[in-house]
Amino acid sequence: MANTSRKWTRETWQIAAAMIQYPNVLADGSSVQDQSVEQWAETLADVVDAGFTELDPTDSWIRLADLPAARRDDFVKLTRDLGLSMPAISTSRRSVIDPEHGDEYLAYGHRVIDTAAAIGAGSVSFGFFGPLTDAQKKALWFWTVDGVKNPEDPAVWRQAVQRIRELGRHAEELGIELALEMYEDTYIGSADSAVRFVTDVGLPNVGINADLGNLVRLHRPVEHWQPMMAKVAPFAKYWHVKNYYRTEDETSGLVVTHPAPLEFGVINYRAAIRMALAHGFDSPFLCEHYGGDGLSVSAANRDYLRRILPRD
């Protein structure tokens, strides 16, 4: 696995904390968008105390691209004062083909790319997954209930390709990569479809966010993680990593899943990462975990990654 051109080692690889544990709208109805710098600092202290040196300002927590420039600069200064860098920005449930808000989210995507350039982030993650349905919001684990599906319509597929290509060209001008998040029932919802989609986009800076955890957690038949990873590895870019226990009863068809620490779930990340490295993978990671103290589990996952990534 020696690669003398690799830009990071296991000690220096950028491994960011996700902010999925923290909502944008707080219990009192106020928004993180309007918090003071001191209030932001209280939240980010959790990230620092968990040992992270990288942060993904996930837009389910804070929409940096929608902050006034002066407020954004205040946020960036705060992160630097806390010893945090921001290698990437992830977007969530703002699909550029949303039937109601697609145009709005496309414009937002361009602002995210500009914001990434302004804060020094080299990666942005986009997806085609829609808002949670009411039934999903009521479920203990939202992925056990079917959500919004991308239409099986060639015209919408072409529109999605065109819009991601547009964003990709913008990002390319700024030296930024785009990673499209694997998520069920979307155009990036299987390995085969994801590869077909990024191939149709046809830009070297547009690849796949190989978030296989989003698929193996489903209570339905899914392709085994290993052939999925083999297909997407040549296209892997900024990578959301999480894992799940998965039990399948072949006689009854019962499937049960539950969030797991990265090293314990059904996906062997030592093997998966080696597949990606063999194809030159050199993008940051994002650690995320649902349930319990997800930030602390993500910190343990970060430490696991540092044990299995290349020494040099």
Residue ranges and their predicted role:
Residues P284-Y290:
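Short acidic/histidine-rich active-site segments
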Residues R10-I15, P23-S30, E54-L55, D81, ...:
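Acidic/histidine-rich catalytic cores of soluble enzymes
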